[in-house]
Amino acid sequence: MPELPEVEVVRRGIASGLEGRKIAGLTVRNPNLRWPVPELERTLCGLEIRTVTRRGKYLLLDCGAGTLILHLGMSGSLRLLALAANIAPQKHDHIDLLLDKGMVLRFRDPRRFGAVLWTTGNATDHPLLSHLGPEPLTEAFDGKLLYSKTRNRSASIKEVLMNSRIVVGVGNIYANEALFLAGIDPANAAGRIGARRCAGLAQAIKETLGRAIEAGGSSLRDFVGSDGNPGYFQQQYWVYSRTGQPCRKCGTNIEQIRQGQRSSFYCPRCQK
């Protein structure tokens, strides 16, 4: 599933091509995504896309009269195409958002876990977004906040990091990578992590996500950016999916454990 860096890469890739453009139409080839796509063509036609922002793993297209909420699901992608290029839709290209000046935003979703929703209220108050915690790349998220949110929690620190009510967008890949940078064993109880180590972990999260965005995200299976190219952050992984390989810092073999429904990867020497 695309995590925060991948969604931010997509946002940056499409924002300049969407902002200021008017919507000319909507083609829905398959409405059966995670939630059925509502009838929106009459509502959207003529509206101008003012801004393209991100909240967690959701993309928000502010159209003035309302906001289009997009989620890429497990394997979705967005591409901004010129109609003149005459690129025929493929099997899993379920939705085209037609724009003025001969452009189209094409939503591809092979596994159909994505979403295209519309709200006329404040987008951040939508039931899918209202519970979300702070954005990790903003000043609202720091070591003090992480320390306060982890007190009296017996769950593992990795599981807590992946709780979107604590902080948004830190999925399995980036939780593993940030914990390595911070030198923290993923199985440690969150409530036992001290203030100093929480500060280091918050900084490691910011650094990891920032580096991933600059590398175009991670492409392990399906992810491609809006230009159709894969990301390259997987080439920089410290621990994720490197079971049995030597730690890039100390040479100790990376180990793998199961936490909930997810695999965790760590260096038993570097992470305590």
Swiss-Prot record:
Keywords from the named record: DNA damage, DNA repair, DNA-binding, Glycosidase, Hydrolase, Lyase, Metal-binding, Multifunctional enzyme, Zinc, Zinc-finger
Zn-finger segments (FPG-type) = 238-272
The active site lies at 2-3, 57, 262
GO terms for MF: 8-oxo-7,8-dihydroguanine DNA N-glycosylase activity; class I DNA-(apurinic or apyrimidinic site) endonuclease activity; damaged DNA binding; zinc ion binding
EC number(s) on file: 3.2.2.23, 4.2.99.18
* Pfam families registered for this protein in UniProt: Fapy_DNA_glyco, H2TH, zf-FPG_IleRS
Q: The organism sits in which domain of life?
A: Bacteria
The catalysed reaction is: Hydrolysis of DNA containing ring-opened 7-methylguanine residues, releasing 2,6-diamino-4-hydroxy-5-(N-methyl)formamidopyrimidine; 2'-deoxyribonucleotide-(2'-deoxyribose 5'-phosphate)-2'-deoxyribonucleotide-DNA = a 3'-end 2'-deoxyribonucleotide-(2,3-dehydro-2,3-deoxyribose 5'-phosphate)-DNA + a 5'-end 5'-phospho-2'-deoxyribonucleoside-DNA + H(+)
Q: Which InterPro entries match?
A: DNA_glyclase/AP_lyase_DNA-bd, DNA_glyclase_Znf_dom_DNA_BS, Formamido-pyr_DNA_Glyclase, FPG_cat, MutM-like_N-ter, Ribosomal_uS13-like_H2TH, Znf_DNA_glyclase/AP_lyase, Znf_FPG/IleRS
Q: Which cofactor does it need?
A: Zn(2+)
Q: Does the keyword Zinc apply?
A: yes
Q: Which SUPFAM superfamilies match?
A: Glucocorticoid receptor-like (DNA-binding domain), N-terminal domain of MutM-like DNA repair proteins, S13-like H2TH domain
What is this protein's function per UniProt? Involved in base excision repair of DNA damaged by oxidation or by mutagenic agents. Acts as a DNA glycosylase that recognizes and removes damaged bases. Has a preference for oxidized purines, such as 7,8-dihydro-8-oxoguanine (8-oxoG). Has AP (apurinic/apyrimidinic) lyase activity and introduces nicks in the DNA strand. Cleaves the DNA backbone by beta-delta elimination to generate a single-strand break at the site of the removed base with both 3'- and 5'-phosphates.
Known partners and oligomeric status: Monomer.
Q: Quote the protein name from its UniProt record.
A: Formamidopyrimidine-DNA glycosylase
Naturally occurring in which organism (per UniProt): Nitrosospira multiformis (strain ATCC 25196 / NCIMB 11849 / C 71)
